[in-house]
Amino acid sequence: VQTSVNKVYTIDNYGSAMAPFYSVLAIWVGCVILVAILKPHARTDNLIDPTRTELFFGRYILFFIMSQLQAFIIIAGDLYILKIQCLHPGLLYLTGFFTSLTFSLLIYALTYSFGDVGKAVVVIVMVLQIAGSSGTFPVELLPEFNRRIYILFPFPYAIDMMRECICGLYGTHYVQ
């Protein structure tokens, strides 16, 4: 009896395999640092009757631009400094763009709405996602609690999208 090996979606090295997890984590941590450094609430002294929506999105634009810049630097660093394997670099940049948009909006909204409590929630969510996002181990190997909650958080989806950009697309799984 002989076994045969049929490699599907091969990865050149361990660094390329772990890049999606650490890139997503870096984008999240960068957004957390943004809300820690910059004030989420704008001064309203010189504004004439601003609506809540104008106040929210007017200040969010700064967070959005900074988070996009950070995502670009992270992805460019992955590709050109770390030289990870990547079959679809353009799609990886697009994934970084949408991941950054999602994370920055979620983190900004929680911080804007709940202040320091929102920041604490963001950190707790980050810890739960690190432990149970299927970024380092398959979901099937995680404790029961993590298997139940991992689908509620954004990390697994962003990691899966980045994995597909790096290793190869699996049908229409990327757009689902």
Model region roles, listed by residue range:
Residues 1-176:
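Membrane-spanning alpha-helical segments of multipass transporters and channels
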